Amino acid sequence: MVIIEAAWVHRRVGVRATLTLCVSLLLGGLASFATAAEPGAQPKAFALWLVDIREQAIAQGISAATVDAAFVGVEPDQRVLRADSRQPEFVQTFEQYLQGRVTPARAKAARVHYKENQALLERIAERYQIDAPYLIAFWALESNFGRLQGNFSIIRSLATLAHDQRRSAFFTRELMAALQVLDEGHVPLDEFVGGWAGAMGQNQFMPSSFLNFAQDFDGDGKKNIWSNTADVWASIAYYLSENKWQAGESWGMSVSIAEPVEFSKLMPMSVTPGCRALRHHTRPLSLVDWSAKGIVPAVEQAADPRVSGRKYAMVVPQAGETVGYLVGKNFRTILSYNCANKYAVSIGLLADMIVADSD
């Protein structure tokens, strides 16, 4: 510790190399991974960058002990960068994506889980004013009912993505949030694992979402999204509630496209900055207006005024597709959880399957 304090003095007068060497030694030889990484300047750049991140984290109030322990041996994870470049939401067609996620087996399991936990789910839904079947739908798709939470180091994954220039600001914020999660003692460092992009727990919350939305529903003093399903479902429910979920409203519906439609003429004049998936939504129209264009619900909707009386945007289909999706306001809330139209449609369809079996 004496060495590191001396190094910080040198940093203030501009001798950056001393700082880098001392911090690297403290973090377990951080710079030594240069020989194991791919050729080029990136390992050295990453090591220097991590020194700056350490400084930022401590300035934000995270203890030096937490930061130093978290950064021991951290180096870029090429698996994370490869996964980032081939996300299924962007490389698969709607049909391929849905076939792999909204399967008969998953729908059956979702209905079983819903029935077994219906009383608890309805208590949670009532408290947060959301619709209970969606809790199971999110749980199913995010972690296969809690069974697949990921085995990537959260810190290493976020450091890798934060160092990458494409979305550096976003992932730097998530890295700081992850360090805060550790610093507050919510999970031990050796258990701090999850998805390749830094999502964690049975509901695959990003660290900032955990800090903002995680719930202690059973009152045991812990916000446990890793092994406590009551906390998992309540955290999802609170997230949806805080992102403008409208209880009792439809997410949308499957539709048949009977004839070609010039969707380019139906696009909004402008799109609110944020989720890029919204760029593929038309402006909202009534079901009557859509029907006049040859787009009709796959299932009759007129009996329910909460559905038939609303306006819906169309997720613009690929050329030649005869099945599409009209989506409402709750669809936007689903997109806030994961900004991908295919993902959001999967959530809606799976929730519909649970509801259909429960009626």
Report each predicted region and the residues it spans.
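Flexible, glycine-rich surface segments
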Residues: 189, 196-304
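Short, functionally critical alpha-helical segments immediately adjacent to catalytic or ligand/cofactor-binding
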Residues: 57, 66-76, 129-146, 178-181, ...
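Bacterial N-terminal signal peptides
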Residues: 17-30
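Secretory-pathway/luminal and periplasmic proteins that interact with or process carbohydrate-rich
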Residues: 76-83, 143-153, 164-168, 184-190, ...
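N-terminal secretory signal peptides that target proteins for export/translocation
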Residues: 1-15
